[in-house]
Design a protein with these regions (language model features):
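Catalytic phosphate/metal-binding cores of nucleic-acid and nucleotide-processing enzymes, i.e., regions
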Residues: 1-119
Length: 119
């Protein structure tokens, strides 16, 4: 695949993630910006309104063959004070998300405590 085609494929997925977040978070489209391909840092730049609802640092990968460990490391390096999350996609497969296992379990523990009426 040509470099330009690969970048276009990545850009489409990055914009898809952006659009999904805008819709689900109910924020203004200008509150989440898609970073240009090849630029350093996290893939989605969020304004305060979006970050308050979704305190994560996003890395997007749309590749047929992917090193998840390198992708996770890249997301962590770019995450600053936010939890790193990697959105991954390949042809004819649904998108997936990679997060730290301990973080994911803690999220679930919070949900269980809320369901049980405990704080």
């Amino acid at each position: 695949m040509k470099t330009s085609s690969a970048k276009a494929k990545g850009r489409r997925f990055q914009q898809w993630v952006r659009d999904q977040l805008i819709e689900q978070l109910g924020v203004h489209p200008e509150d989440i910006e898609s970073r240009s391909m090849g630029a350093g840092g996290e893939d989605l730049i969020m304004a305060r309104a979006a970050r308050e609802k979704f305190p994560y640092s996003i890395e997007c990968k749309n590749q047929e063959s992917l090193n998840v460990w390198k992708s996770s490391e890249q997301a962590t390096e770019n995450s600053g004070d936010y939890e790193p999350v990697v959105f991954i996609k390949r042809n004819n497969q649904k998108p997936l998300v990679i997060v730290d296992a301990n973080y994911f379990i803690k999220l679930h523990e919070k949900d269980l405590k809320c369901d049980d009426g405990h704080t």
